[in-house]
Amino acid sequence: PDYRKAVYEWVKQDADVKLAHSVIATPGGSGAVSMSIETFLDAGDTLIIPDIAWGNYALMASVNNIDVERYHMFEEDHFNLCSVKETIQKVMLKQDHICMIINDPCHNPTGYSLTKEEWKELIAFLNEVSKTHSVVLLNDIAYIDYSYQLSTSRDYMETFNDISDNVMIVVEFSCSKALTSYGLRCGGAVILAQKEEAVREAEIFMEKKARATWSNIPNAAMSNFVWIVTEG
């Protein structure tokens, strides 16, 4: 419980996030992302990712027989929301649920961070999509603690408060990056939704998935993180 609370507080920090939430301990950020993909998509489904991305997103999908559809990340010097919309609308034609990855802030490998206005526009569109399709947004924040604007790096999370009841956000956190402790394999999946029952349903499934896959993550890694963020 101490670790899960510490992860949630570290992830949101001063951001005024008012959503129901829970945290699943994972072996690094990669464990959080892979478990989320496996939880919210079935074989034959399609995962939406950026065209410029960490290669393991596609690999994680592939080993689970999940297809990948890529949106163009940039339009000149800004986030290409038009391509995101077109890609989601394409996937909507073949399945009744949407799962997409946004690697932000400090996108790997470009370093780009969406503006708060870009996040507002994205959330507004996902709410429209959610009128007919359930939506899960995987927000990979592996490099958030390397932001040039560290003091405001979590501000965008306040836009999450506007999600509809049919949208869920899972924030994928990596202690491996935040504390440069790669070998300890420590991270978390922070589940966010408007309703407690939606969070609990996802939490139960992800707990079972974790138990069946890696059982538990190292206690030393969890204890180390709690000590650093509370007493270190």
Language model regions located:
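Conserved core segment of the aminotransferase class I/II
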Residues: N161-G232
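Walker B catalytic acidic pair
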Residues: D140-I141
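Hydrophobic/aromatic residues located in beta-strands of well-ordered beta-sheets
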Residues: L47, V135-L137, I169
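Conserved core of the PLP fold type I
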Residues: P1-H133, I144-I163
